[in-house]
Amino acid sequence: MAPEIQEGQEPVGYSRILIATDGSECSALAGRHAIYLAEGLAAELFVLYVVNVARAFHTGIHYGEAVAELERFGKEATARIREMAEKRGVRCEERVVSGRPHDAIITVSEEIEADLVVVGSTGMRSVERVLIGSESEKVLYHCKRPVLLIRDT
């Protein structure tokens, strides 16, 4: 049995949903979940890609070229989700920002006053998880907004 809403309490509502994408299949799945929720709740969708500047240092090409390539990739990744959303009649805004992914996701979620943050989570080997953790885990543990974690199946 669901708990009753107490006098003076407002029911939870989602009018702004943030979906963070890295362009992966798991992010596409998370995007489909976010679109489904946004459509059903008449919520606005914000699609975010974070250019991981630390990754640009390890590409083996000039830093500026690497960042530009990651920005292009990010615009394509956000556009794919936006196109899916628009086909369903969901209002959508795209953002591509630079920084550490979990920090940027949390910052943008606060800036737009997101009611829900949706992120995908791909499997990591246990050694990687112990050493660095995943970006989605960092969002899950540090974000003050509700987070919906979509696991890769």
Where are each of the predicted segments found?
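A short acidic, glycine-rich active-site loop
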Residues: 64-76
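Short, hinge-like loop/turn segments at secondary-structure boundaries
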Residues: 63-66, 111-113, 135-136
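Small/aliphatic-rich secondary-structure junction motif
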Residues: 7-61
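Structural beta-alpha unit
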Residues: 1-12, 83-117
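Glycine-rich, Arg-bearing micro-motifs that act as flexible, cationic patches
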Residues: 116-141
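Short, flexible loop segments at boundaries between secondary-structure elements
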Residues: 145-153
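Conserved beta-strand positions in the Rossmann-like core of class I SAM-dependent methyltransferases
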Residues: 46, 93, 148
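Short secondary-structure boundary segments
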Residues: 49, 120-122, 151-152
